[in-house]
């Protein structure tokens, strides 16, 4: 981590240390490249943070990037992405990470792959182990979703993209509720809670587990109101007795009393131990929601089948561009194939 702490290093010479090999993807806040470290011959991923908003960077500092660097410098766990280097000037910052072969979103969407109960258990075990480590250090991830769960060539899953991560624990600290991608956002966040804890990450884990089982997003809402409607229609509308304090949340709206569908009728192939875990993750009262440590002690993880070792987990059978083409065809979208297709059209969306 010597490179991260260095000051006054010439940015151009630092950047020349890395040979760009491929464009991996572009998000709202960053562009990601595959590169080779010329000094070590190691394959890495470089996340170039885009210039922040004027208000955020008016003193020449991208605070989101600095927060991500600061947090990642303090973390060391097999299931957390490794920050290898960081360099930049003012609000232009590049972060260098372990290169990861794929992500859980790609695995879920690759219909040529069969995900067995042992595979799913392995993904959940690694996710929860990384999350337990974070929560023990009083850090919330706040943006868990399948494409932020990366997999290396050995099948090791690592939590990534800590741009929204935050330390927690102060009883009087107020947080923003505009975190977590909507489909994985917990009910308390959707109701505008400004004080929350590990429950926001655990609800997201439940949504990811459901997506692994169903192979489609579990609760794909179009707006915050639609998201809450889908949650309550599916899982039932909670009462004040089930979730004390619900009606006092800043953006609370009373909903029709939906009965919901029992989990065993939604996840028809799930055993009692898996249903017990899902029930714990989808508990409406965030104070009673299952924690990462509690989840790892559930009988689901000690019962058979045992989790599949990482090196035996499935890997994408087709190229990313072929996978995207298949998804478009499934949606009835015809795409014209052309020679020399723009790299941006076939680039994999990958966040670090």
Swiss-Prot record:
Residues binding ATP: 24-32, 47
GO biological process, one term: regulation of cell cycle
Chemical reaction(s) catalysed: L-seryl-[protein] + ATP = O-phospho-L-seryl-[protein] + ADP + H(+); L-threonyl-[protein] + ATP = O-phospho-L-threonyl-[protein] + ADP + H(+); [DNA-directed RNA polymerase] + ATP = phospho-[DNA-directed RNA polymerase] + ADP + H(+)
Record-linked Pfam families: Pkinase
The Protein kinase domain, residue ranges: 18-301
Stated family: Belongs to the protein kinase superfamily. CMGC Ser/Thr protein kinase family. CDC2/CDKX subfamily.
Name of the protein this chain belongs to: Cyclin-dependent kinase 7
UniProt source species: Xenopus laevis (African clawed frog)
This protein's encoding gene: cdk7
